Amino acid sequence: KKKQIQRKKGENKVTEKNWNQLTHEEKRAERVKRWLEPPDIPFVSPQAKKDYVARLKRFADAYRMKKPDRVPVDVPFGDLPLKWKGYTLKDAMYNYDLIPQVWNEFMTKFEMDTFPAPAMSVLPGRVYDMVGCHLYKYPGNGLPDNALGFQFAEGEYMMGDEYDALIKDPSDFWVRTYLPRVFTSFGPYRNISPFTSIVELPGGYFANYAVPEMQKTLKTFMEAGEEFLKYSAVVGSCVEEAAKLGIPTPKTGGLDKAPFDTIGDTLRGTQGIMKDIYRHPDKLHIAMDRLADIQIEQAVNACNASGGLLVTFPLHKGADSFMSRKQFEVFYWPSLRKVINGLIDEGLIVFLFAEGSYMERLDMVNEFPKGTV
C-alpha cells in the first residue's frame, strides 16, 4: 500500500485516497518535497545542514531538468577508498570495521555532493559464504584474494521449456526452482509443495520443516540475517557520519531492470534469451509483461518505504552491440517502457544507466514527460 506522505507540522496530509487522485506531476512534487526535508540529523554545524539541503536540491533540480546553482558532482568511486589506504576488497568484506575507518577518512579528504555508500562496493562476504551464493564470484570465492572487484556469474538458471511455470506463478518458480539453483542453502525448497497448497487442514504442510536439511537451511538463514545486520549497522554508520558533515546519500528506490534483462541476466543467460527471441517469442513477451507488473510494484513499494525519489535502471542487453534496433523495438523496449511509465505515474524519476552504447535508440527516451527520465 502507498504510505501517507507526511507534510510539515501544521499542514495537510496527503492520504492514500487522495494520492490516487493526484497527477504524476503533483505526486512528483510531493516526493521531491519529502526528499528534500532533512531527517533528524545531528549536523556538526549550521553550515553542514545548509550544505546538506543545498546538495540535495542541486540534484533534484538536475533530475527535473531545472537549472541548478552549479553542476552536481556525483563520483561513483567504488572501492577506491580501500586502495587509497592500502587494503584489498577482501579485507573489508570480512572485516567490516575497516569500512567506516577508511570511508570516513576518504570523505573528509575529498569534497563531493553525495556520499556513495559502501554497500554497492563491499559485499558482506560471510553472508554470501553462509548461503552458498553462486551468482557472484568475489575475492576468495572464485577470484584471487587480491582481486579488485566482484563479478556476476551469468548462467542458464531457467531452462527454455520453463516459461509456462514462470508465467503461471513467478513467486513459486523463484522459491522452488530458481533460488535452489543459485543458492546452495535453498536446496531443500526444491522438494516442498507450493505455499498455495495451504488451504484447509494445513497441519501436514509443516512436516516439510521437520526434515533435517530444511532445519539446517532455516538455521543458516537466521545466522545469515544476523550477520547481515552487523554489516548493515557498519554501512549505516558511514552514511550517518557523512550526513552529519552535510553530505547526503540520496534516498532511492534502489535498482530496477528492464524485464528483458531480468530474464536475460538473471534467468536464461545471454545465449538462452537470444535463442528465445526466435524459439519462444510469444512466451518471452508474456513473461516480460508479467514481470513488468511485479517490478513496478516492487520499486514503488521500495520508494514509499525509504522516501526515495529515484529508481536506477542498469541497461544491459538492449545496447547497440547486443541487438538490432528492430529487435530492441520488438523485444526490449515495450516492457521497459511499461515499467518506466508505471513509475512515472507514481511520481518517481527514472535514471537510465546505459551500460554500453545506446546512441542508435536514444531518441526513444524523448517520448516521456520532461524531467521524469
Name what the model sees in each region:
Residues 1-13:
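Short, Lys/Arg-enriched N-terminal segments with co-localized hydrophobic residues
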